[in-house]
């Protein structure tokens, strides 16, 4: 069946902001779907609230709406655009839930919109646990024994039937949000209460425990003629009980016999047929009991998922692209496989001659109070994938690509320590983020495969592989460097050992080891990912390294530029940097360069095989980058686009003779090194908060007295504000130094005077060495002290006088020219009274670049990439700042709901995982829409609770007056209430938590409060008011921890509920007029 001609326009729903469980894999699938459908001549309309995505670029769709993905908003877009069809399978759980809402509210029927890719019944049958259970029984497949509950009474009835331990999962939530494993009644009641609260349908599925079972996934694609292919089988290294997003996974499955594989294969096809997936990809998850071989179906997702992004990158088969074409009527045999240049049809199952390993990346160091144990609720924030010819090689490559300070199976424990064995037993039994390293330590401690298997049920095949690597390490330790001959070196490199790990074992520097390896003539070769195990020749350069005979890299002699990506997502370094890398590749390709991308993150658009001319799916480490440079000999390498990851390599690459283009590593160092930076600030007569760099406790206390409290303290060279704190007195400083000196490994600690109540600004600029153009000035809504990645910001600024803005422009230009920036630069400034302070300068791409580009209609990342390659801003015709005639607000999105026990207060350490954008004619409208996009429900009336620190008291009267005019009643704690009364306003007093009951938390628990403004100062007051914020989060009450955000909310509420939807393309056209 060729494509349908009865539909002309298709609406695609995106996934919204990046949250744990739903990351940039949906940008990758959505971008592919847009491309695939436009190629076929359809008009594509896209809705996504996340400005940091490639899919929201104005060139990706015919009409782009950066608007909240809520059915009310989408209904307005449908009314305006009148699409014929809606494709809901590309935007994760967010898009599916929104599509079901549109169906239920009658919007699709009213405007005659057909759902394609999956219909409402299919989605419901797969997502609704009881319907799914019945469907599986009808085709003779078992599901775990389970029951469904809509209340605590029903939950207890199910428990009687199943017993402990049991697994609890809320319906229609994603990444296992709200679920968990209960071993006793107390835990059971706590998890059920949380789950009922978080499930949009107030429904729980309670399963028998399958903990310790083996877990497998099948990625299946099916068309409407019932052609089915298995793209890839995936095996979880961690047994059941750990969410698949937090498991180490391996593709293809390693421990299945051929017969077992065929059984799973047939079962997964039967599942798709029964559920009715006719057009596109699904993943089906199975559990198998290692003792009895009993098989159960755990779940299926009738959409493109995290696993399908992994399967696409692992095999080279573009699932999302194919799924989009199937949704408009094609069948698999009609589509050709792009990777083999059309030599094979899409109905050929990929076959692979290598092993892929995915490791999750966690961010527990950001959330001190979080429970770091892995359960059925997803907690990882990113992932890394590696390709090798054996499991050992791909595992070791993934370990070093993770960027957690290891270069392989580094030891975690000092085994001579008396406590070490009990720590080891605990870490092996209860899964945590570092279990694989403890498994290696267990072998070092002399434990056997059987003993370890008995503790954690990890398949013995995997354990034997790790044991073998540990044996090799023990052997190398006894040798000197000269004793490693060519044969041994070759054997070790084939097993994936990094130069850095071998150097550590032998006791030499990494550089010495590399020189020795090169002398022995041991170099990697590069193989291609081609979907057909090299059966057909392929022109697609999607490459990975291994140590074998034949090299398939086949480099050209064209002018090449290499872009280093950002590695795995983490808090502080996410999709924004990937966006910049993609834009650099697109711009330089257009200009005739051959572009080479190096990255190891399977979720992103940068690792799509057609983003750049050549893709090396490799860890972004010194060794791996140098080997690629040796083969490709690029004319230039870009390090300023991938966040901190490539920047850390800049000096070493430069020393090895790699041509780094753009801002020089020395200039980057001048901005990052405090003492050199200070000299520059003084030379330009600019202001900086008084500061000092200290190397001991005594020195710190003396310096603090001179600078004056409060202080911002932090280790030098960090991204995302890791281990930053604000201290208000000497005992707090002493406590910080005791805890933080470990963070800084003898590197100094920085003290800055904290600018209390200052307004912060972010400025992005592009410089070509002679001219500087300001991209935008953004005003932060939260005042200084909140990390810039966590603060909401407004473009253009909503309350900065023009003369201050002009002064800031001048300062930024001076610094750019002084540093000799070539490319992008970001400056953070603070305004206290009339004084402008320079907080920091980053001569690289910053996380605001995508947001700014969407606001001003110009891609800064593309312009800066061309500047790095030698063009001037005049040649590029970008010579003056574009100031939009509308307001845009960027708001951060946080993962606090996933981490019970963590305080949802904002501070100098970054905690957000993603962002949304709201656009409006006024600041209030834009702010209101950004809140909506971040799934924050703004109250329209009720009772507002206010309690603020002394510094904020002068501002409280205006906020209280606004709220009363908007119809709120005010309650406040004694000190704040006194001020509000003094202004002649009506207020009710309420006790602080420390003052006895009934207190404010009682009011929150009784749902008597609808809005909370709670600001704090110092460690004690933060601790005292913790329960206010945590309860507000659990009861979904809008809570802000800064007075400035309180003022912004009043603006948003004045705007009211009526919001207009705006096409990005129209906004940009208005700027050019």
Curated annotation (Swiss-Prot):
Q: Which species?
A: Pseudomonas syringae pv. tomato (strain ATCC BAA-871 / DC3000)
Q: Quick one: where's region Carboxyphosphate synthetic domain?
A: 1-403
Listed under GO cellular component are: cytoplasm
Family in the record: Belongs to the CarB family.
Q: What does this protein do?
A: Large subunit of the glutamine-dependent carbamoyl phosphate synthetase (CPSase). CPSase catalyzes the formation of carbamoyl phosphate from the ammonia moiety of glutamine, carbonate, and phosphate donated by ATP, constituting the first step of 2 biosynthetic pathways, one leading to arginine and/or urea and the other to pyrimidine nucleotides.
Q: Where does ATP 1 bind?
A: 129, 169, 175-176, 208, 210, 215, 241-243, 285, 299
Assembly description: Composed of two chains; the small (or glutamine) chain promotes the hydrolysis of glutamine to ammonia, which is used by the large (or ammonia) chain to synthesize carbamoyl phosphate. Tetramer of heterodimers (alpha,beta)4.
Q: How is the cofactor bound?
A: Binds 4 Mg(2+) or Mn(2+) ions per subunit.
* Catalysed reactions listed for this entry: hydrogencarbonate + L-glutamine + 2 ATP + H2O = carbamoyl phosphate + L-glutamate + 2 ADP + phosphate + 2 H(+)
The protein's name is: Carbamoyl phosphate synthase large chain
The membrane spanning regions, by residue number, are none
């Amino acid at each position: 069946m060729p494509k349908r001609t009865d539909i002309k326009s298709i609406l695609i729903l995106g996934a919204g902001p990046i949250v744990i469980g739903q990351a940039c894999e949906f940008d990758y699938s959505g971008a592919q779907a847009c491309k695939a459908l436009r190629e076929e001549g359809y008009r594509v309309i896209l809705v996504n609230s996340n400005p940091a995505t490639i899919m929201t670029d104005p060139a990706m769709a015919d009409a782009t709406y950066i608007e909240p993905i809520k059915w009310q908003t989408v209904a307005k877009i449908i009314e305006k655009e009148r699409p014929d069809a809606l494709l809901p399978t590309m935007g994760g759980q967010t898009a599916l839930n929104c599509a079901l809402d549109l169906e239920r509210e009658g919007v699709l029927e009213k405007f005659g919109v057909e759902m394609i890719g999956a219909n409402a019944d299919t989605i419901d049958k797969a997502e609704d646990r009881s319907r799914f259970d019945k469907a599986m029984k009808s085709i003779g497949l078992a599901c775990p024994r389970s029951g469904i509950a809509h209340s605590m009474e029903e939950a207890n009835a199910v428990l009687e039937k199943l017993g402990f331990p049991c697994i609890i999962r809320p319906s229609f939530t994603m990444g296992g949000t709200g679920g968990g494993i209960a071993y006793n009644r107390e835990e059971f009641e706590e998890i059920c209460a949380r789950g009922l609260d978080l499930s949009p349908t107030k429904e729980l599925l309670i399963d028998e425990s399958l903990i310790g079972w083996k877990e497998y996934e099948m990625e299946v694609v099916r068309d409407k003629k019932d052609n089915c292919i298995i793209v890839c089988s995936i095996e979880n290294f961690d047994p059941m009980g750990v969410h698949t997003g937090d498991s180490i996974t391996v593709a293809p499955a390693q421990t299945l016999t051929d017969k077992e594989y065929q059984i799973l294969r047939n079962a997964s096809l039967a599942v798709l047929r029964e559920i009715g997936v006719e057009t596109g990809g699904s993943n089906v998850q199975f559990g198998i009991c290692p003792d009895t071989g009993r098989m159960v179906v755990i779940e299926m997702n009738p959409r493109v998922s995290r696993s399908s992004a992994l399967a696409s990158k692992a095999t080279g088969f573009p699932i999302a692209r194919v799924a989009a074409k199937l949704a408009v009527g094609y069948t698999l045999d009609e589509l050709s496989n792009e990777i083999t240049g059309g030599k094979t049809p899409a109905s050929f199952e990929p076959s692979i001659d290598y092993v892929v390993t995915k490791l999750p990346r966690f961010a527990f160091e950001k959330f001190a109070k979080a429970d770091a144990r892995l359960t059925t609720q997803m907690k990882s924030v990113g992932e890394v994938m590696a390709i090798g010819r054996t499991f050992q090689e791909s595992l070791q490559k993934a370990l070093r690509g993770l960027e957690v300070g290891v270069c392989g199976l580094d030891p975690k424990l000092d085994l001579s320590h008396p406590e070490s064995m009990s720590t080891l037993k605990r870490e092996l039994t209860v899964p945590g983020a570092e279990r694989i390293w403890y498994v290696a330590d267990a072998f070092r401690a002399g434990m056997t495969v059987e003993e370890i298997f008995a503790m954690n049920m990890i398949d013995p095949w995997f354990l034997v592989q790790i044991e073998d690597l540990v044996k090799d390490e023990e052997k190398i330790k006894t040798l000197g460097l000269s004793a490693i001959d060519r044969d041994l070196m070759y054997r070790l490199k084939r097993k994936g050992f990094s130069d850095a790990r071998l150097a550590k074992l032998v006791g030499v520097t990494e550089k010495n080891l590399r020189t020795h390896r090169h002398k022995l003539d041991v170099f990697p070769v590069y193989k291609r990912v081609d979907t057909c195990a090299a059966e057909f020749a392929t022109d697609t350069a999607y490459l990975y390294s291994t140590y074998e005979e034949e090299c398939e890299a086949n480099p050209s002699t064209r002018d090449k530029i290499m872009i280093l990506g950002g590695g795995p997502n983490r808090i502080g370094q996410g999709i924004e940097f990937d966006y910049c890398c993609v834009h650099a590749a697109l711009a330089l390709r257009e200009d005739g360069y051959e572009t080479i991308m190096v990255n190891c993150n399977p979720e992103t658009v940068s690792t799509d095989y057609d983003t750049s001319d050549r893709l090396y799916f490799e860890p972004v480490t010194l060794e791996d980058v140098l080997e690629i440079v040796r083969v490709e000999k690029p004319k230039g390498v870009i390090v300023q686009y991938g966040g901190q990851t490539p920047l850390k390599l800049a000096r070493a690459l430069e020393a090895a003779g790699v041509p780094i283009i753009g801002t020089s590593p020395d200039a980057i160092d001048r901005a990052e090194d405090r003492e050199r930076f200070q000299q520059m600030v003084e030379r330009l007569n600019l202001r900086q908060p008084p500061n000092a760099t200290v190397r001991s406790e005594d020195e710190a206390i003396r310096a603090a007295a001179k600078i004056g409290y409060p202080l911002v303290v932090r280790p030098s060279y960090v991204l995302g504000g890791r281990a930053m704190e604000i201290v208000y007195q000497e005992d707090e400083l002493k406590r910080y130094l005791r805890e933080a000196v470990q963070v800084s490994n003898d590197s100094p600690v920085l003290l800055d005077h904290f600018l209390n109540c200052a307004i912060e600004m972010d400025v992005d600029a592009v410089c070509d060495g002679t001219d500087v153009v300001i991209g935008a000035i953004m005003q932060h809504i939260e005042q200084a002290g909140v990390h810039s990645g966590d603060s909401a910001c407004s473009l253009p600024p909503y309350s900065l006088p023009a003369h201050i803005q002009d002064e800031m422009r001048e300062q930024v230009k001076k610094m750019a020219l002084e540093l000799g920036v070539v490319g992008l630069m970001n400056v953070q400034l603070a305004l206290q009274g009339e004084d402008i302070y320079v907080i920091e300068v980053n001569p690289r791409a910053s996380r605001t670049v995508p947001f700014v580009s969407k606001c001003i209609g110009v891609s800064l990342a593309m312009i800066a990439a061309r500047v790095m390659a030698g063009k001037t801003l005049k040649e590029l015709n970008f010579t003056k700042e574009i100031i939009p005639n509308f307001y845009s607000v960027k708001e951060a999105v946080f993962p606090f709901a996933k981490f019970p026990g963590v305080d949802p207060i904002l501070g100098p350490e970054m905690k957000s995982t993603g962002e949304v954008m709201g656009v409006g004619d006024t600041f209030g409208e834009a702010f209101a829409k950004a809140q909506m996009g971040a799934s924050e429900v703004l109250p329209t009336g009720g009772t507002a609770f206010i309690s603020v620190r002394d510094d904020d008291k002068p501002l409280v009267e205006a906020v209280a007056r606004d709220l009363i005019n908007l119809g709120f009643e005010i309650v406040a704690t004694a000190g704040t209430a006194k001020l509000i009364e003094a202004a002649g306003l009506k207020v009710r007093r309420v006790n602080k938590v420390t003052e006895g009951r009934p207190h404010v938390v009682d009011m929150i628990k009784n749902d008597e409060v609808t809005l909370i403004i709670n600001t704090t100062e110092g460690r004690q007051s933060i601790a005292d008011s913790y329960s206010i914020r945590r309860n507000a989060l659990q009861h979904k009450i809008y809570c802000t921890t800064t007075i400035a955000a309180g003022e912004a909310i009043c603006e948003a509420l004045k705007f009211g509920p009526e919001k207009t939807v705006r096409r990005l393309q129209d906004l940009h056209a208005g700027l050019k007029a």
